[in-house]
């Protein structure tokens, strides 16, 4: 799809796997997630997201069934059946690139580090928070002291 200004829909990225994570006053992180997770993430309009389909298809397996090989296999078989119908399951894994400011990431944490949030985005937000905190430990002691306040658990444990 093109237009007179040679612009593309910014949601679709390319070569996202080649991008490196960066954490500071601004941040950029890439991770694997599903279409469902990306849809939840897109609700944070203060952050920027891009996605790229993977060459090799894989699917999210809910943690509640992943330890049971029979249930996990049945789940994955169902995902492949849906995919074979030329329908993309919302549980298909994609590469996601998220970027924005530190302040807006903390706003996301306030919304997504909660037991009421969609499981995938809650788990990924926690993982990104811990990675962000670890990176700031050496590079930005002031932000490191701030981000530590948000690393103790769910939203109800935040200082504000």
Regions found by a protein language model. Give the residues of each.
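A conserved ligand/cofactor-binding region detector
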Residues: 1-160
């Amino acid at each position: 799809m093109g237009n007179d200004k040679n612009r593309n829909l910014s949601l679709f990225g390319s070569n996202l796997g080649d991008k490196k994570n960066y954490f500071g006053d601004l941040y950029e992180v890439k991770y694997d997630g599903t279409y469902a997770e990306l849809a939840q993430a897109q609700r944070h309009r203060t952050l920027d997201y891009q996605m790229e389909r993977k060459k090799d298809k894989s699917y999210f397996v809910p943690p509640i069934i992943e330890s049971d090989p029979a249930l996990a296999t049945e789940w994955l078989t169902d995902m492949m059946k849906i995919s074979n119908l030329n329908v993309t399951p919302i549980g298909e894994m994609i590469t996601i690139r998220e970027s924005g400011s530190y302040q807006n990431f903390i706003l996301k944490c306030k919304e997504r580090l909660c037991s009421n949030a969609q499981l995938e985005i809650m788990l990924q937000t926690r993982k990104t928070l811990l990675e962000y905190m670890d990176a700031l430990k050496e590079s930005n002691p002031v932000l490191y002291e701030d981000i530590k306040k948000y690393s103790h658990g769910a939203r109800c444990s935040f200082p504000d």
